[in-house]
Amino acid sequence: MALPAFAARALGPPLQPEQGAPARTTCPRRHSRVEAELAASRPGSVAASVRAGPPRGVSLGFNSPPLQDKPPKAFSSLAGALRAPLFALLPRGRRRRMHDLRRRWDLGSLCRALLTRGLAAVGHSLKHVLSAIFSKIFGPLASVGNMDEKSNKLLLALVMLFLFAVIVLQYVCPGTECQLLRLQAFSSPVPDPYRSEDESSARFVPRYNFSRGDLLRKVDFDIKGDDLIVFLHIQKTGGTTFGRHLVRNIQLEQPCECRVGQKKCTCHRPGKRETWLFSRFSTGWSCGLHADWTELTSCVPAVVDGKRDARLRPSRNFHYITILRDPVSRYLSEWRHVQRGATWKASLHVCDGRPPTSEELPSCYTGDDWSGCPLKEFMDCPYNLANNRQVRMLSDLTLVGCYNLSVMPEKQRNKVLLESAKSNLKHMAFFGLTEFQRKTQYLFEKTFNMNFISPFTQYNTTRASSVEINEEIQKRIEGLNFLDMELYSYAKDLFLQRYQFMRQKEHQDARRKRQEQRKFLKGRFLQTHFQSQSQGQSQSQSPGQNLSQNPNPNPNQNLTQNLSHNLTPSSNPNSTQRENRGSQKQGSGQGQGDSGTSNGTNDYIGSVETWR
């Protein structure tokens, strides 16, 4: 059977260019039969110097030399294994178009070649790296020539191991919040993460006298029951950051579910479809935008249990929490926020069952917003709610007639508002300060017995700190917020006293626990020693012989002698000698034996603690 023309040309020697013709090179590619015949009909041409390949469906002869840059079989199989799942990930319409393009332009061979050549290049580079490493370790035995087959298999194993690690990592950490952080939070904690906070803080001198009940804040929060945490969010106090900590950074049996693109998270109780947190990021602004204490106390029970009958409503404990900030910094931050177009028009300001009228609460600007407002204009408005905002939002406005300024004189009104805000703040379950992030985290954890996963961060640079004001403007801002200044001074004093009290209580509890462990170890040792001594005496001697040798037996003296011989080398030798001399004296009383027992046991306990 005669061979085809293209096969004969493929098996025959390649045509040489004409003598004197310039040497030219071309990129090897697949030729059709027509191109091969045309190339063969032009001896001396460039196409004649390139060996024509067979058409589709016809393989090369067994004598044809292999390509020099043919990748290993491992990479070809890996490319084929990776191409199918990658192609399956495309949408249905995209896959149909890719099939059409592949039938029309034959892109499969191009993709296959690119993938195999890329893997081959990576394999060769890794092979040289591995050969260099093995040559350093094993010497001349690890040569590149001897590692061709082994390195290819090793490379394939490394690639598969890498892909497996990526799959496991995507399973364990599916989103931006890796579950490993939650596992790390359940592990053993740092011995004392707040010691640096104690050392860095300056010495604090209290100004107010608070009782033990005011300083000791320990809330028995039952997240599986009906208790509810209500977050009172005051504008520009860092409440947004703290609110995110509550839904994203807190360690819970059933964490809040926060999905990408959604502003609210689902914070359900374990085993129930009820929320345990009433805040912006869990329930939204259900009582209005930045609702104050007056609105929340009358709105939250109706929102949570509004659909139930009054007789079937559970007896809930509403634990109110909030965050305060330095009044000057907060005022400047609100001014910068208003400059950017914030209005808080959605705030309801409901008091005593109705919102204020336009005469009771006039607006400081005309138009849609107050963007571009200068600081002087912001301070000149007498109806600006930014003035003394923290006192107004923490006090009971029903005591002063809500927003009706004609109910009582201004001086009396300010006094009632300030005292109401102080009282509500002191009786709140928890409040924090923006200027003390780590202390805020500590007090919240100790109050509710709920730990955060990662520590809070103290930001020293804010938009308010970037505003440069002179002393005159600062004095005026303090004058406009004189009630907030008084409230913040009171809150800071109470906050720092609570922190110091809780830290001292924690140290006392740790010291008491060590003492209990010491007593337990001492009793355990004495009990074990008496049992072993009594068993040894009963087995070695009879009762009559024991009485004849020692008419007045004293087990404490024997214990002292045994302790003096069995103590660790760290024990005091002088005390051992004194115990031996005391045991040899005749007529020694019970008190001397007890003294020796106490000394020997204390030395033993001390040696055990030194070893630990």
UniProtKB/Swiss-Prot annotation:
The active site is at residue 290. Residues 531-564 have a biased composition (Low complexity). Residues 9-52, 529-612 are annotated as: Disordered. It is a single-pass type II membrane protein. Residues 28-612 are lumenal. It is found in: Membrane. 3'-phosphoadenylyl sulfate binds at residues 233-241, 325, 333, 457-459, 463-464. The chain crosses the membrane at residues 5-27. It holds the Pfam family Sulfotransfer_2. Residues 1-4 are cytoplasmic. Glycans are attached at residues 209, 404, 460, 546, 558, 562, 574, 599. One of its GO terms (cellular component) is Golgi apparatus. Keywords: Glycoprotein, Membrane, Signal-anchor, Transferase, Transmembrane, Transmembrane helix. It catalyses: alpha-D-glucosaminyl-[heparan sulfate](n) + 3'-phosphoadenylyl sulfate = 6-sulfo-alpha-D-glucosaminyl-[heparan sulfate](n) + adenosine 3',5'-bisphosphate + H(+). The keyword Glycosyltransferase does not apply. 6-O-sulfation enzyme which catalyzes the transfer of sulfate from 3'-phosphoadenosine 5'-phosphosulfate (PAPS) to position 6 of the N-sulfoglucosamine residue (GlcNS) of heparan sulfate. This is Heparan-sulfate 6-O-sulfotransferase 2. It comes from Mus musculus. The gene is Hs6st2.
